[in-house]
Amino acid sequence: MPVLNLNDPQAVERYEEFMRQSPYGQVTQDLGWAKVKNNWEPVDVYLEDDQGAIIAAMSMLLGDTPTDKKFAYASKGPVMDVTDVDLLDRLVDEAVKALDGRAYVLRFDPEVAYSDEFNTTLQDHGYVTRNRNVADAGMHATIQPRLNMVLDLTKFPDAKTTLDLYPSKTKSKIKRPFRDGVEVHSGNSATELDEFFKTYTTMAERHGITHRPIEYFQRMQAAFDADTMRIFVAEREGKLLSTGIALKYGRKIWYMYAGSMDGNTYYAPYAVQSEMIQWALDTNTDLYDLGGIESESTDDSLYVFKHVFVKDAPREYIGEIDKVLDPEVYAELVKD
């Protein structure tokens, strides 16, 4: 059974190389992600071709539930062309063997476009899909948002700077914080993390929402170097205003976390976005992912902000694909 032996350095290196070189690679499928989610149990499986080369892989994390069965989740996985459903079935079969009856479901949510045809094909292959059928519950009906604002930089082959991507009206918005004296620096040190965490917790308190502990982000720093993870910090006259965390992996840079201070931020979040996009341009990265939105509506503040930078329509993903392993527990725990 092709289950990755995490105690075999050569096997781990080969697996990681495949994950990082694959056009389907996702940072949440990297082995480092299990170090971030250190209260979950990692299980990693793969398929090889006749020459012994890895052709598909899935990194699962197993979490506890109120029952005696685990929840198995491959975030944004697997790493393969998921539209090849026969190959997907083979990989899922290996995953099910590796889970050995311990999980009630294997869930994965690849960044593949939704279509009625693909949705039906998955269901015909025995999978339960959660997408438009749960959309009325909003963006948090699924673990990952299904509607994402993604800037496709391959459409701008001659662009050298962020401003090259936009018409004059948008250029003016992006320039405004810099005209007002906002400056942005980036790195992956404890100093930048402390600055991020201050803005992150301030924003959470302002909106009355929970937030992750600093140890979570420290584990993220330990798992990913500055070529993969960068913290962007916007200041004006030495005063902290806004921050963001972005991760570069595979074909994209993903704007993952953000924070801002109370009061006048002089449009510093625009400056942070500008510099993150510049990082993508400087590294010839295909996509810049601003993450999820509630809806394509001016009533959604997330959409309004992200639409400044992404003029295309949101990408609608296929959503969650469940391989149900214990129907009774699944019916108890999964509510549509």
Curated annotation (Swiss-Prot):
GO molecular function, one term: UDP-N-acetylmuramoylpentapeptide-lysine N6-alanyltransferase activity
Keyword line: Acyltransferase, Cell shape, Cell wall biogenesis/degradation, Peptidoglycan synthesis, Transferase
Annotated phenotype, changing residue 257 to F: Reduces activity 2-fold
Impact noted for substituting residue 215 to Q: No effect on activity
Outcome after substituting residue 212 to M: Loss of activity
E.C. number(s) listed in UniProt: 2.3.2.10
Xref: PROSITE patterns: FEMABX
Keyword Cell wall biogenesis/degradation (UniProt): yes
Known outcome of mutating residue 306 to C: Reduces activity 2.5-fold
Group of enzyme by EC: transferase
Catalytic reaction annotation: UDP-N-acetyl-alpha-D-muramoyl-L-alanyl-gamma-D-glutamyl-L-lysyl-D-alanyl-D-alanine + L-alanyl-tRNA(Ala) = UDP-N-acetyl-alpha-D-muramoyl-L-alanyl-gamma-D-glutamyl-N(6)-(L-alanyl)-L-lysyl-D-alanyl-D-alanine + tRNA(Ala) + H(+)
Residue numbers binding substrate: 37-40, 104, 212, 216, 257
Phenotype for residue 104 to F: No effect on activity
Result of altering residue 205 to Q: No effect on activity
InterPro entries (alphabetical): Acyl_CoA_acyltransferase (IPR016181), FEMABX (IPR003447), PG_Glycine_Bridge_Synth (IPR050644)
Primary role: Involved in the synthesis of the bacterial cell wall. Catalyzes the addition of alanine into the interchain peptide bridge of peptidoglycan precursor using aminoacyl-tRNA(Ala) as amino acid donor. This alanine is added to the epsilon-amino group of the L-lysine of the peptidoglycan UDP-N-acetyl-alpha-D-muramoyl-L-alanyl-D-glutamyl-L-lysyl-D-alanyl-D-alanine, in a ribosome-independent mechanism. Specific for UDP-N-acetyl-muramoyl-pentapeptide. Has no activity toward UDP-N-acetyl-muramoyl-tetrapeptide or UDP-N-acetyl-muramoyl-tripeptide. Also acts on L-seryl-tRNA(Ser).
Protein name according to UniProt: UDP-N-acetylmuramoylpentapeptide-lysine N(6)-alanyltransferase
Encoding gene (name): femX
